[in-house]
Amino acid sequence: MSAHVQVTREIAAPADILWQMVADVPRMGEWSPENESAQWLGGATEARPGATFRGTNRNGSKRWSSVGTIVEADPGRSLAFRVKAAGMNVAEWSYRFEPTAQGCVVTESWTDRRNPVLKVLSRRVTGVADRATHNREGMAQTLERLAAAAEQQATPSA
C-alpha cells in the first residue's frame, strides 16, 4: 500500500494568485524546505499537461534530482505532477485550491509511488528514513511560506 499525506491550510489570498505561484515550478524552491531549484525541460515554459521539469532537492548534505511531468493543470483550481527518478515512479504531488470568503483553502497532497527497491535506495540517496513524516512536516512549511508570500502579494500597499 502506498503512503499518502495531505496538508491543508487556509490562506488569505485569491486562488488564482496561489495557483500561479505554485504552477511557476522554477519558484518552488522559494516555498519548499527540500526543493532547491527546478527547470522546465524540452522547451516547456509553463504548467500544462505533458510539460516536464527537473527538480533538484536537498536534505542536509544529500542532494538529488528527479523529473516531474505535469498531469493536471486547471488554473485557479488544481495542479498535479508525477515524479520519476532513473525512469522509476517516485511520487505524485497535487495542489487543490478552494475559494473561501477570506481567500482560499490550499490542500497539498503527496502519494508515494516507489517500489520496495526504490524505497531502500532513496533512504540512502536522500537521508530520509520516514518519507511520509518528513513530507508532512515539509508540506506544512511549504504552505506556511506560500501563505506569507501570497498574503503579502494580495495585500494592497498603503
Describe the role of every protein-language-model region.
Residues 1, 47, 60-64, 85-89, ...:
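A generic structural micro-feature
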Residues 1-42, 145, 151, 158:
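Hydrophobic ligand-binding cavity/cleft-lining segments
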Residues 2-8, 16, 52, 65, ...:
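Intrinsic-disorder/low-complexity, polar/charged segments enriched in Ser/Thr/Lys/Arg/Asp/Glu/Gln
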Residues 6, 26-69, 73-78:
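Short beta-edge strand/loop motif at the mouth of beta-sheet-based domains
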Residues 8-12, 39, 69, 82, ...:
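Generic structural detector for well-ordered beta-strands
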Residues 15-16, 46, 71-77, 96-105, ...:
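A short, structured loop/turn motif at beta-sheet edges
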Residues 18-22, 28, 53, 70, ...:
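Hydrophobic pocket/interface hotspot
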Residues 83-141, 146:
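Beta-strand/loop substructures that line and gate deep hydrophobic ligand-binding cavities in soluble
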